């Protein structure tokens, strides 16, 4: 009797399988993979892709970044006024370096903050690991903010404030370099390393859970936290305007303690990738050998067994993939030069307009608010909609990021033209006889579209760049390759320093126009050079699954934002 039952069950199961095969054979000519299985080649081409849930450990890392960015943007946003004006000017300042001098020093600040990640990444990937490096550099960060706070007190002389400011900028820059190069790889490290798999939705639709989309969503979420933190500009600019600069710098100093607290609480929760054995030196040796022989096969142990190379064939493939990514980053300095206008020349332009009681540097919050609103929209609506028709690959996103950046500069040039057309000072705002410190008659709200366009360009170019740097780097070099991406911002700032002599009235229309043309051309050059990388994306990503790195990928997922907050409380 039991044998007959077993035979019936087997027969019924076979019937079900045949039924599924018949019902889906038109869409999927190959065999249908069961839920949880790795998709077939045909399914990879035809099924829609979705992301997995964001692991809980990512939230603690995100809190570290939120607190650090709260402090970074909160203290740096008042910098332009602090440097440009004196205590008797309107807007109020301290150092009195004028617009071109303040813009040059502002670009040095950005340059320094984005060249130091190279050092921070080297320390992490070679000696201390990401977690320990972040912890140590956070202490340096706090020391720098403390110096800035003390030397901005009203009792300090202008020379003392200038010396303290330069010292603080150097120390904070070292601190942010150690944090910035490691915190984004650390948050992505918390995502389990799993192959794509089949999932059946409640609607019955069969989809592919794609780990690369999960990484994409993690970086979108990461960037969301950055911009929530950057809303500190609202508080610090108000404190600067209504109290003084010392109050604006005291708030970031106090808030940074949250970053240290999140690091401490997550110490036993974070997945920490082991430090590689001189992995950066190995990668340079491998690359040098391949370049001198004009072929990466010359560095493969399997093809050169007599050489006894201290790496594997997979490592050679990973280094080659990373170099492709680094080539993509070479066009980014033009984009970062455009992006940098938001923190200096846009602020100066706002100071030439009627503010109606607002601080001239508060409008930077529009950029953050736009990103906070549009990241969830892009993640849940725009990107999935586009993926229904065509893969929306990284190179395509970055190209459109350049185009939106160029559009922002076009708008800024047109707006500056109308600022110069408005009285009473026309092309010498705030600085004509009889109208000293009187802005031209044009409303500051007209700057809003420029910040909006910059924000959309960030979602497309900046977030995708972070994702590209992480996914194309070898396992033990995530921080170093991330620092290569970040250092492009430093090169953009160096271009800004060279441009600063013309960043003054009445030349700003041509400054913005030149930036618009440069960004537009750079975007198209980028597209023609790298558009074929889109076709290699899946092949490069598959390299991560060729062998196990020892990480079992067991992390608790976040089911929803609400539940994750409850779990943390």
Swiss-Prot record:
SUPFAM superfamilies: MFS general substrate transporter
Chain positions covered by the region annotation Disordered: 1-43
Keywords: Cell membrane, Glycoprotein, Membrane, Peptide transport, Protein transport, Transmembrane, Transmembrane helix, Transport
Keyword Glycosyltransferase part of the UniProt annotation: no
Localization per record: Cell membrane
Gene3D superfamilies: MFS general substrate transporter like domains
GO biological process: oligopeptide transport; protein transport
Superkingdom to which the source organism belongs: Eukaryota
A single MF term (Gene Ontology): transmembrane transporter activity
Protein task: Peptide transporter that exploits the inwardly directed proton motive force to facilitate the cellular uptake of di/tripeptides. Shows strong uptake specificity towards the dipeptides Tyr-Phe and Leu-Gly and the tripeptide Phe-Gly-Gly, when compared to PTR_A and PTR_B. Also able to import peptide-based antifungals such as the peptide-nucleoside drug nikkomycin Z as well as the glucosamine-6-phosphate synthase inhibitor, L-norvalyl-N3-(4-methoxyfumaroyl)-L-2,3-diaminopropionoic acid (Nva-FMDP).
Tagged with keyword Phosphoprotein: no
Topology in the lipid bilayer: Multi-pass membrane protein
Parts of the chain that traverse the membrane: 54-74, 104-124, 134-154, 159-179, 215-235, 245-265, 322-342, 366-386, 398-418, 444-464, 479-499, 510-530
GO CC, alphabetical: plasma membrane
Residues glycosylated per entry: 98, 212
Biased composition (Basic and acidic residues): 1-25
First-listed, main subcellular location of the protein, grouped into a coarse class: membrane
The protein's name: Peptide transporter PTR_C
Observed phenotype of the null mutant: Leads to a marked reduction in the transport capabilities of di/tripeptides. Results in increased resistance toward the peptide-nucleoside drug nikkomycin Z as well as the glucosamine-6-phosphate synthase inhibitor, L-norvalyl-N3-(4-methoxyfumaroyl)-L-2,3-diaminopropionoic acid (Nva-FMDP).
Catalytic activity annotation: a dipeptide(out) + H(+)(out) = a dipeptide(in) + H(+)(in); an L-amino acid tripeptide(out) + H(+)(out) = an L-amino acid tripeptide(in) + H(+)(in)
One of the Pfam families matching this protein, by short name: PTR2
Family assignment from sequence similarity: Belongs to the major facilitator superfamily. Proton-dependent oligopeptide transporter (POT/PTR) (TC 2.A.17) family.
Disulphide bond pairs: none
InterPro entries per UniProt: MFS_trans_sf, POT_fam, PTR2_symporter_CS
């Amino acid at each position: 009797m039991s044998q007959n039952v077993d035979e019936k069950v087997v027969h019924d199961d076979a019937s079900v399988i045949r039924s599924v095969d018949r019902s889906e054979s038109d869409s999927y000519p190959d065999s249908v993979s069961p839920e949880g299985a790795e998709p077939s080649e045909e399914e990879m081409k035809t099924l829609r892709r979705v992301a997995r849930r964001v692991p809980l450990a990512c939230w603690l890392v995100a809190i570290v970044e939120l607190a650090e960015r709260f402090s970074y943007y909160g203290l740096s946003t008042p910098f332009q006024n602090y440097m440009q004006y004196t205590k008797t000017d309107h807007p109020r300042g301290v150092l009195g370096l004028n617009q071109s001098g303040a813009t040059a020093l502002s670009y040095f600040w950005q340059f320094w903050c984005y060249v130091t990640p190279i050092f921070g990444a080297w320390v992490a990937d070679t000696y201390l690991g990401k977690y320990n490096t972040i912890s140590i550099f956070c202490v340096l960060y706090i020391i720098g903010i403390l110096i800035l706070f003390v030397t901005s007190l009203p009792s300090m002389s202008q020379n003392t404030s200038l010396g303290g400011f330069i010292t603080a900028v150097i120390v904070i820059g070292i601190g942010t370099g150690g944090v910035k190069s490691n915190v984004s790889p650390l948050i992505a490290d918390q995502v389990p390393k799993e192959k794509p798999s089949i999932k059946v939705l409640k609607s019955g639709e069969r989809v592919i859970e794609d780990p690369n989309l999960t990484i994409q969503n993690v970086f979108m979420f990461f960037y969301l936290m950055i911009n929530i933190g950057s809303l500190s500009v609202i508080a610090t600019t108000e404190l600067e305007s209504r109290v003084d600069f010392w109050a604006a710098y005291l708030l970031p100093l106090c808030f940074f303690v949250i970053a240290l607290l999140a690091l401490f609480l997550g110490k036993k929760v974070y997945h920490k990738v082991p430090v590689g054995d001189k992995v950066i030196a190995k990668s340079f040796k491998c690359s040098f050998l391949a370049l001198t022989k004009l072929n990466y096969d010359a560095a493969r142990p399997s093809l050169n067994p007599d050489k006894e190379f201290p790496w594997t064939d997979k490592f050679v493939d990973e280094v080659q993939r990373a170099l492709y990514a680094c080539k993509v980053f070479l066009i980014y300095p033009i984009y970062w030069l455009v992006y940098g206008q938001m923190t200096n020349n846009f602020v100066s332009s706002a100071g030439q307009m009627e503010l109606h009681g607002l601080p001239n540097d508060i409008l930077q919050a529009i950029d953050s608010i736009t990103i906070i609103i549009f990241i969830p929209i892009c993640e849940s609506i725009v990107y999935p909609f586009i993926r229904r028709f065509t893969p929306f690959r990284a190179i395509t996103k970055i190209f459109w990021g350049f185009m939106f950046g160029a559009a922002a500069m076009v708008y800024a040039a047109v707006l500056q033209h109308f600022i110069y057309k408005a009285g009473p000072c026309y092309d010498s705002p705030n600085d004509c006889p009889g109208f000293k410190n009187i802005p031209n008659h044009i409303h500051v709200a007209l700057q809003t579209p420029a910040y909006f366009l910059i924000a959309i360009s960030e979602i497309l170019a900046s977030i995708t760049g972070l994702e590209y740097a992480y996914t194309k780097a070898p396992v033990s070099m995530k921080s170093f390759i991330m620092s290569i991406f970040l250092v492009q911002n430093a090169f953009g700032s160096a271009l800004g320093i060279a441009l600063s002599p013309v960043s003054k009235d009445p030349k700003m229309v041509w400054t913005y126009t030149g930036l618009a043309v440069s960004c537009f051309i750079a975007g198209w050059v980028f597209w023609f050079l790298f558009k074929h990388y889109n076709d290699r994306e899946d092949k490069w990503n598959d390299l991560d699954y060729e062998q196990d790195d020892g990480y079992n990928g067991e992390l608790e997922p976040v089911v929803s934002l609400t539940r994750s907050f409850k779990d943390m409380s």
